Curated annotation (Swiss-Prot):
CDD domains assigned to the protein according to its UniProt record, in alphabetical order: DPM1_like
Region (Disordered): 1-27
Role according to the record: Transfers mannose from GDP-mannose to dolichol monophosphate to form dolichol phosphate mannose (Dol-P-Man) which is the mannosyl donor in pathways leading to N-glycosylation, glycosyl phosphatidylinositol membrane anchoring, and O-mannosylation of proteins.
Membrane topology, Cytoplasmic segments: 1-263
GO cellular component: endoplasmic reticulum membrane
Pathway: Protein modification; protein glycosylation
Entry keywords, A to Z: Endoplasmic reticulum, Glycosyltransferase, Magnesium, Manganese, Membrane, Metal-binding, Transferase, Transmembrane, Transmembrane helix
Gene that this polypeptide is encoded by: DPM1
Transmembrane segments: 264-284
Record-annotated disulphide pairs: none
GO biological process: dolichol phosphate mannose biosynthetic process; dolichol-linked oligosaccharide biosynthetic process; GPI anchor biosynthetic process; protein O-linked mannosylation
Binding site for Mg(2+): 125, 127
Name recorded for this polypeptide: Dolichol-phosphate mannosyltransferase
Family: Belongs to the glycosyltransferase 2 family.
Length: 294
């Protein structure tokens, strides 16, 4: 069950945009999907920064972009914040899910309800810079059907200040996905896809999976030449708490097994060997090293 808070089309047409300056057309050409849980404090800065980013572009298509917040029944004032933003003329709506949970299924729900032919997924915590969204959308306006915001592009490094063991784990995680896709950052949650490519993958998507971008990269069947990459710097969380915990790596490995079977029908031995190495590093860094005071 879910509750959608959305102004009716006629009301949108009568509403004069406030500081947003967005088009209020009922048929947006682009959609930005934002899965959220207890992110109320970040919603206003997210929407207003997106508005400013679109306003700085000369593209009329970008001006006609909708934002869809898919909220897992946070009850933290998110609905009221979106309602206030709507009254100010921002093209934003919220879907409140009362019986479903999880980031991947929230993204899938948003993509299914999006009216734009070009769709972007981004986090609500402002670690994905709203100012980079126009570049991702423009990258889909051509021959590309998938665009990935990468933290490993030229001049960008997310993990340069990480400890050695964490950098090795990060590199190992990307290495494990290499046979599945040539994308430099398949674990990124900042990505875009065309409606057509999403529909190709929709019946095969694991909505309970972990990394939805990787799932879509594999199951939409996009060729490496159809993937664009836009480097971005991974920002600091502005409000709220990080939802990462020690289970994320194991969820990722479970997803990789499912994707290898989907793509190749089997799991190669090299995958098992790298998994054992990554697990050994994880156990050392999170269990043994703290016990030994290393």
């Amino acid at each position: 069950m879910s509750i959608a808070l959305d102004m009716d089309a006629s009301a949108k047409m009568r509403k004069q945009p406030g500081s947003s300056g967005w088009s209020t057309s009922s048929t947006p050409s682009c959609s930005v999907i934002v899965p959220a849980f207890r992110e109320n404090l970040n919603l206003r800065p997210l929407v207003t920064r997106l508005s400013s980013a679109f306003a700085s572009q000369s593209s009329s298509e970008l001006a006609n972009t909708e934002i869809i917040i898919v909220d897992d029944n946070s009850r933290d004032g998110s609905v009221e914040t979106v309602s206030a933003l709507q009254s100010e003329g921002y093209n934003v709506r919220i879907i409140v899910r009362t019986s479903e949970r999880g980031l991947s299924s929230a993204v899938v729900r948003g993509f299914r309800e999006a009216r734009g032919q070009r769709m972007i997924c981004m986090d609500a915590d402002l670690q994905h810079p709203p100012e980079a969204v126009p570049s991702l959308l423009l990258a889909l306006n051509g021959q590309k059907s998938f665009v990935l915001g990468t933290r490993y592009g030229v001049g960008v490094s997310m993990d340069k200040d990480w400890p050695l063991h964490r950098r090795i784990i990060s590199s190992g995680a990307r290495m494990l996905a290499r046979p599945l896709t040539s994308a430099s950052d398949p674990m990124s949650g900042f990505f875009g896809i065309t409606k057509h490519s999403f529909h190709t993958a929709d019946h095969h998507i694991n909505a309970q999976g972990f990394k939805i971008a990787l799932d879509l990269l594999v199951k939409s069947g996009v060729h490496s030449t159809d993937i664009a990459e836009v480097p971005f710097s991974f920002g600091l969380r502005q409000e709220g708490e990080s939802k990462l915990d020690g289970k994320v790596m194991f969820k990722y490995l479970q997803q990789l097994v499912e994707l290898y079977r989907f793509r190749f029908g089997t799991v190669p031995i090299v995958f098992v060997l790298i998994v054992l190495l990554v697990l050994a590093l994880y156990i050392w860094s999170h269990v043994l090293a703290p016990m030994l005071g290393a």
